[in-house]
Regions:
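Receiver (REC) domain active-site loop signature in two-component systems and cognate sites
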Residues: 61, 70
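C-terminal output/effector regions of signal-responsive regulators
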Residues: 134-136, 142-205
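C-terminal output helix
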Residues: 100, 118-127
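Short amphipathic alpha-helix used as the core "switch/output" element in two-component signaling
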Residues: 54, 76-87
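Acidic catalytic/metal-coordinating carboxylates
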Residues: 48-51, 72-77
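Two-component/phosphorelay signaling modules centered on CheY-like receiver
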Residues: 24-44
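Active-site residues of response regulator receiver
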Residues: 67, 94
Length: 205
């Protein structure tokens, strides 16, 4: 089945890399073919959950497409481990749509859920949603980490200022300017300067 769809790509123009895990070889072959026809690069195939995890860790794909019912380790357990390791978003496939399975898949960290039988028109939107959700979560986590880092830096600078005020007799603006100037002169971050002040002056107190 030929397609004129543009290949799904990352922001830098690289084709999306996918690992497919499905214990039934014929179905796995169909999924791989379906993905390749719409432009995904299938970089690894697995027949059980443990193999899927190993491939994901080794290949670091953009996406993992995985059946729920598999030997050795089921897809939901494998998805949970892949999600916890923050390797890639996982899309789970299943022949069942019970509420309990959907909830387990969600709790495991799966980004999307597709019920068999499906066509590329069902699968591709789920993959794109999973990639989009994963990117949003990663951006949010990065923003939170950045905010936390800024808050910690501010606290360290405040503590360093207090030490400079008490040990060098500087005013608060002078102490801040001293940290700022030292940071620029020595090509260090203000956090690094503050940590040095706390370590060197603080240890003498």
């Amino acid at each position: 089945m030929a397609t004129n769809e543009e290949a799904p790509k990352t922001e830098n123009g690289v084709v999306r890399r996918v690992v497919v895990a499905e214990d039934e070889a014929v179905i796995r072959l169909d999924i791989v073919e379906m993905l390749r026809e719409v432009g995904y690069d299938v970089v690894g195939e697995a027949a059980d959950g443990e193999s899927a995890i190993r491939l994901a860790e080794e290949l670091r794909p953009d996406l993992v497409v995985m059946d729920i019912k598999m030997p050795v380790l089921d897809g939901i357990s494998a998805a949970e481990r892949i999600a916890k390791a923050r390797i890639a978003p996982v899309v789970l496939l299943t022949a069942f749509s019970q509420k309990e399975l959907v909830e387990r898949a969600r709790d495991a960290g799966a980004m999307a859920y597709v019920v068999k039988p499906f066509t590329s028109n069902d699968l591709v939107p789920a993959l794109e949603i999973a990639l989009s959700r994963h990117a949003e979560i990663a951006a949010l986590e990065s923003e939170i980490a950045d905010m936390t880092d800024r808050f910690e830096t501010r606290k360290l600078v405040e503590r360093a200022k207090s030490l400079l005020i008490s040990s060098m007799g500087l005013s608060e603006p002078e102490a801040f300017r001293w940290i700022q100037k030292t940071s620029m002169d020595r090509r260090l971050t203000m956090r690094e300067v503050a940590e040095t002040v706390l370590e060197q002056i603080g240890s003498k107190k």
